[in-house]
Amino acid sequence: MTRALPAPAPTAACPCGAGAYGRCCGPFHAGDAVPATAEQLMRSRYSAYVLHDTAYLRRTWHPSTCPTDLERGEADAPATRWLGLDVKRHTQQDPTHATVEFVARYKVGGRAHRLHETSRFVRLDAGGAESPQGRWLYVDGDLT
């Protein structure tokens, strides 16, 4: 499954809550732009979860930690209703490493849940080497 839901209209609110979809996460999902910061990448990945865009999630996941069964995990996604995102902190340790702490609220089967995570990101060039000119990728995260 690449995308189970259609992309929002460009003027519609972005699922990440940071603006209009066409000026926020939409260009990243379409491949027209790349996130300049780890926070932008994290927000675009949250929106991709909302839209069930597994192709984008895979494209922005570090190859050493990306699950091989990502699509299978998305089979339960329609039962998940994402409610909102709150970015608590974005810290850039150096030009190629950053963390983003966030809380994502969602419902499954009518029950409310919170996902509180500190995610780790690395910036890699096309050859897979760490580079300040590379693109940000999600590595992993610690749940709180």
UniProtKB/Swiss-Prot annotation:
Segments traversing the membrane: none
Pfam families noted in UniProt: YchJ_M-like
Signal peptide as annotated in the record: none
Disulfide-bonded cysteines: none
NCBIfam families assigned: PRK01842.1
PANTHER family on file: ADENYLATE CYCLASE-ASSOCIATED CAP C-TERMINAL DOMAIN-CONTAINING PROTEIN, UPF0225 PROTEIN SCO1677
Family statement: Belongs to the UPF0225 family.
Protein's name according to its UniProt entry: UPF0225 protein RSc0270
Organism: Ralstonia nicotianae (strain ATCC BAA-1114 / GMI1000)
